[in-house]
Amino acid sequence: MGKTLSLEYPIYKRTPRKSYVNRVKEQIRCRDAYTLGLTGRGVCVAVLDTGAYPHRDFEDRISGFADVVNHRPGPYDDCGHGTHICGIIGGSGAVSDGRYQGMAPGCTLAAVKVLDRKGNGSAADVLAGIGWILDRKDQLGIRIVNISVGSYGKRGMSEDSALVKGVNRAWDAGLVVVVAAGNNGPAPLSVTTPGISRKVITVGCSDDHM
């Protein structure tokens, strides 16, 4: 239960500022879904991360917030990663006049802060966040859970680990759980926990040049 988790990549790394969201949207044919009226409306996505700043692109669609780290009441993000993830998932593009829009701009978001300002956290906090989601999934209409964090190390590479059992419990409760694979692959044992679960959707990069 004391296992340490971290973000799947360092958000403070000094790299050229580029946006790949629009290119990815073309790759997965988001526009086709939009023409059918599928924008995420009516679906709440829970994001287990560093929290969420009430950004103008989605501030009126944060339907729930919990802070299991500092126990503060209102939405905030002292790291930035959780806000970044919420923007990719459900940003409206309002600030950029529609130029940078998330994948599901009509969805609502339930942000659960399980990581601290440095992007680190514990398995216990992630499990507490999953418990919060399960308790409120019907009330908030949560159907999807995004977890862009993970734990490396052979000790965590077990389907009997508490983290894997936690995400499996969410899946068995009818939630679609999407977890980051990590950034150390492709190589044996490079997928982080809880991405090793056989039940969840574990996602890695689809383009080596991104």
Language-model segments: which ranges?
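Substrate-binding/access-modulating region of protease and related hydrolase catalytic domains
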Residues: 114-199, 205-210
